[in-house]
Amino acid sequence: GQGGTVATLHKFIPGSTSLWDFSLEQLSNHRVGYENLCATAAEVGKLTAEMHQALIDTDSSSAFAPIAPTVPESEASANAMVDHAQNVWNTAKAAELSPPLRHRIDQMLSHHVSINDALRTAVTSVQTAAYIRVHGDYHLGQILITPESRRIEVIDFEGEPQKTLAERRRKTSVYKDLASMSRSFDYLCFQAHRTGAAQHSASQLVRIFLEAYAVGSGGACFYPDNEKERMALLNGYMLDKAIYELGYEVHYRPDWIDVPLRALERYLHSGSLLKT
C-alpha cells in the first residue's frame, strides 16, 4: 500500500520570532529600520532559493522529482485561477461596503474580463522552467528570525489549509511562492504605515528579494532562463494572489481591502502589480 507520514519532529529555535513581527518593529525605527529590512529581504531571497533547491530530487522516481510543465497542466492551472477569480468577483459584487470602496470595487470589476484573460495568458504561455513541489503558503509569518544572529528559517510546509492534500502536493511554478512572498512585503509596508511608521516602498523590497533569489537559483531547472517568461509568471501569480487576498479581505477583514485593491488598480493602470 501507499505509505504516509505519522508524525514529524522539528528543531526548537530559542529566542526566535516571526519575520513579520520583527519587520514591523524594524520599520518603526524609520530610515535605519528600512535599510536593515532591505538587507533582510535579500537574505529571504537567498533562503527561498535554497528552499526550492532542497525541494527537488534528481531521482526521476521520487515524489520530489521536477517535471516539465505540459500544455494540459498549464491550461488546468489557468482554468483553476480563472474559476477562482470569478468566484471572488461575484463575492466582491455582492459585498456590503462603504460607498468609496463600493465605487472602487465596481470600477475594478468593470475590467474583470481583461484580468481573467491576463491570468490565462500568463500561465499558459510557453514555459522553460520545471514545476516542483513548493511551500505553498509562503509569507513573512512563515519565516522565523533569531534577532541576535539574524538567522532565518522557514516553517510550516503544510501548504494552504483550505486545499486538499493532493492539491498541496501538486507540482507548480516556483512563482507561486515568489508571488506570495512579494505580496507579503506589500502587506507589511501597509500595516507599518497604518501603525505610525513612515511610508516605505514594498516594490524595492520585492526587487531586492527577487534579485537575491535569481542569484541563488541561476541555472536551476525551476528558474526560467529568460526575462520575458520570468515577468509573465511573476505578474500572473501575483495577480492570482491579489485576487485571493481581495476575496479573503471582503469576507473577513474589510479594513484590509485596500491592500489587494490597490495592487489590482495598479495592475489595471500599468500592467504590473509592482510600482515603477
Q: Where does each model-flagged region fall?
A:
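An alpha-helical support segment within catalytic cores of ATP-dependent transferases
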Residues: 88-133
